[in-house]
């Protein structure tokens, strides 16, 4: 049993694998040739597609035999069949299939498959068909000879690439060219497993610099129908290139190299087996000699001083082991040999890293002076200072790592302040009103200074002015026609502030008991009659007064205004519900002989009769100038009355007290639930309340207007007040007085749209 088991043949061992593959290939060639004989018979119905497939299969069988160094059976029948097949190339696709077949046959002829006469005839047929698809190029024999151009290129730019068996080599002249060069690869070719097949492309016109090993910018290379990496026009590396590894694109048997494009010089193209050589650690190099030394002229004004030279390689920033430089380099700085070689084995630019001079491998020189310095100095030395005479000394090295600093350092700025400072955090959630309370609760309006303001400043050089900034009279183009009594202004300016309101020091203003009550300006403007002929010398009027109804008649309506003491009743209104209440502060009234004086203010305007006006006055006139007071924010009218007359024009009667018009709430505000908010925002639930303060609901007009006698007094009009509490308690009080009649609605001025809705 054991003997029989041992004698039983194992599968695959009866015939060698190579012999089995050759036998299968022989059967394939026999079947393909039989089918092709049928297509060349007279009167046979030829299928072009089947004919082309049979030609490609015939070529593959020949290639397999060439790759395995095998000669198939009945090879003597091939020449006659091939000659007959070449006569049937009528269309382009059939010629392409025949070209592939004849390329394989040509290599079979070189291997001695056929007789010499038959081989010559078949090679001639192959060249004739190939000319339809491009020339083959001129061969370049003797590329391995020491004096050849390609040998010099290899020595200069590929010193560690070992050239093996050359598969194809040819030269290309300048101009547009389409080449199709075929070559075959046999398994019996001498090569090692470590060797790779690489493609070399080099220009032979100028080989002094690495530009000669760059790919032609307008030329593409294809192997077996596939583009070579970085050597086709769609993806090309325009710089110096290493030999391209094309092993994966080739196969045993016949291969085809196609080159097409415009050559701008003479090139050599080679495909060969190559290997790599490890660079030596201690190469044999020539010594560096300073070339082009110019003697110092006695008349020269340029004196060469000492130079600082780094002992680190500019490539790796590490200590130089073997100091080298280019033959034509003029500088003292060296670089390391090993670093320079390894970086050019990856990217063969071959230029000095310090001066960018071309330095190919034969031009590398060893600097003996720097080698001696490196041997004598300590290991931690970084730089040396070399004099013009050749003497050198080591610079002091503290061993400390320099701290990074900014490139730009401004004057009077600490360079380390930015590094030592922590992160800068900006608070974007704060309330802008809290910041504005220190300087007043008013919006600052940028305006171009007018001539009247400049004259006002020159007339009051000895007075410390603090004009109010929330001046909105210019929005409605109201002329400053109010003339105040100078004696009243002087009395107000000389009035001392109350102790609990403000105190003045020699260095500036100091304020105490500042209540943090934000003041929000009404978002909707109050309609005000526009003057049709404003004066060019108008400036903002900051006086809170009661204007008369526009009178078309030439007579003037009188408005009497009396000064208001800094401490008294003041009213305000805001759009927020928690501040929508009336505040009052009581203080002893200021006694002055001018308290009972009335200022007659003429106001003129042109508008139709039976028209009421809405006036919003919130500011203090610029002529009020107290030395240590931030100004009276408004003058409250003490007497006002109105009467309606014929279209000739109504008159306004004075009102004795402000309390006759407005009910004042003396309750103290509760600020316990106060919280900051954005300017102009509305808290939930306050929208309707804010609109109630701003919307003026018109009443239905009567069918016939009632004529009133000029002597008959008119009903007291509805009055709306708004409170504006300044952070400075010395400020006067600002009121808004709106005159109107429910039976006679007031038409809106130009540019103001009257709200519509149900009437009350």
From Swiss-Prot:
UniProt-listed Gene3D superfamilies: Zinc/RING finger domain, C3HC4 (zinc finger)
UniProt-listed Enzyme Commission number(s): 2.3.2.-
Phenotype on disruption: No obvious growth difference under standard greenhouse conditions. Altered sulfur metabolism. Reduced growth in high osmotic pressure (mannitol) and in response to abscisic acid (ABA), but enhanced growth and fitness in high salt (NaCl) condition. Abnormal steady state levels of SUMO conjugates in various conditions. Lost ability to form a high molecular mass complex with PIAL1 and MOM1. Released transcriptional silencing of target genes (e.g.
The organism's place on the tree of life at top rank: Eukaryota
InterPro entries (UniProt xref): Znf_MIZ, Znf_RING/FYVE/PHD
First-level EC class: transferase
Pfam families: zf-MIZ
Subcellular location: Nucleus
GO biological process: positive regulation of sulfur metabolic process; protein sumoylation; regulation of gene silencing by regulatory ncRNA; response to abscisic acid; response to osmotic stress; response to salt stress
Keywords from the named record: Ligase, Metal-binding, Nucleus, Transferase, Ubl conjugation pathway, Zinc, Zinc-finger
Keyword Iron-sulfur in record: no
Annotated region described as Interacting domain (IND), required for interaction with MOM1 and PIAL1, given as residue ranges: 143-301
Location of the region described as Disordered in the Swiss-Prot/TrEMBL record: 440-471, 492-522, 631-657, 699-760
UniProt keyword Ribonucleoprotein present: no
PROSITE patterns: ZF_SP_RING
One GO cellular component term: nucleus
Polar residues compositional bias, start-end: 492-518, 631-653, 699-729
Entry binding sites for Zn(2+): 329, 331, 352, 355
Zinc finger feature spans (SP-RING-type): 298-379
Main location group: nucleus
Matching PANTHER family: TONALLI, ISOFORM E (PTHR10782:SF4), ZINC FINGER MIZ DOMAIN-CONTAINING PROTEIN (PTHR10782)
Family assignment from sequence similarity: Belongs to the PIAL protein ligase family.
Subunit structure: Homodimer. Interacts with MOM1 and PIAL1 to form a high molecular mass complex which mediates transcriptional silencing at heterochromatin regions.
Name listed for the protein in its UniProt record: E4 SUMO-protein ligase PIAL2
Species this protein is from: Arabidopsis thaliana
Organism lineage string: Eukaryota, Viridiplantae, Streptophyta, Embryophyta, Tracheophyta
